[in-house]
Amino acid sequence: MALSARVRRGYALGSIATGTFGTVPGLLLLPYLTDTLGVAAAAAGLIVFVPKAWDVVLNPVAGRISDRRGARRPFLLRAGVALAVTFALVFSGPAGPPAVAAVWVVVAFLACATAYAFFQVPFNAMPAEITADPAERTRMMSWRVAVIAVAILLSGGTAPLVVTALGHAAMGAYVGVLLLVGTVGAHVATRGVVEEPVAAPVGTLREQLRVVLAVPDFRRLLLAFVVQALGVGILLAGVAYVARYLLADPAAASLLFVAFVGPALLVSPLWERFSARRGKRAGYLASTAVLVVGALALSAAATDLPGLAYAAAGLAGIGYAGTQLSPLAMLPDVAAAATRATGVNRTGVFTGVWTAGETLGLALGPGLYGLVLAVGGYVASVDGGAVQPPGALLAIAVGFSVVPAVLVAASLVPITRYSLDLTGSADVRP
């Protein structure tokens, strides 16, 4: 069934929340801990990771709960409001001593991650249930990726400026408003949408997870997406450090974000057309290859040619747009095909496991970047004014470019084995 333009665009508003939440913590939380609260780099990386690791456990549970409730839409509003409030709390805690400030961040971020799980999982599950047309889902994802690009551009480009002008607490409140606009907007715009009634799954959560993970096409898609999320998470975590220590201009963080995300506004429709002609797998492979080349080229940030770094960020952004569009359109196809094959709707469990994997990748990114900094001898401070040794500067550059490029390149292997594009039905064999 064809969806109205209002529904396609309105659903995409939820990506203001997912794009913002997927960007700002990875961009600002690690440097907030190391350069404002004075937390050691390795400990800060662990602090960023723990709440996201909690989401890895919680997301399948959220999927299971939303499967049993049936309607996904009410979760968007309730969890969305909680998400906005708790995010603001993350950056409004005490400034010291470092141990007390770190505990505040962990507790507030845990609450924030919990709310996000109960928003993101039902949100991701909706496309498979409101339309049975794979092409329609791709159109939905095209709008969604465009909105994600705007959200990343807006939040990633302006949040550092708000920090500079007004401080971290004001930034937390500002981002909270963005999250509220996205979650409430998606809830209102999808009013009246009919979610296809399919038998809910029976059995324990463990049994449902076993069934979902036994679908080969899902495993392949999930592995590729998680590895890419890890690479992108590392890249995002390095932006503030690259701007401050390699480009010698903290404001360059916003410019890098504009260069990285801006092209997505133009190329998302092109990736959609490419996938329509060549297949979603081909689109995913091509965009992944572009992202690899762009990430490698980001090593130019360590040279005296910052213009090349911005150009490389733009190239990486072109690839990144496709690596968001393709898998987000492929996931509902796999879930819907599995539902047709089994007669049981496990879409919530599929999306719960999917978002858990994405969360794990994005969470590990800053943590691993923090470890790379620690190995390089990075010096933490409370004012961001510490002089970094050569090893730390090298770690900043390598962690920002080479490490993400290698990880994203590795994701090409499982993508090549995805079969739904070729067979017309998902590989659901155990």
Model-derived features with residue positions:
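Membrane-embedded alpha-helical bundles of multi-pass transporters/translocases
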Residues: M1-P430
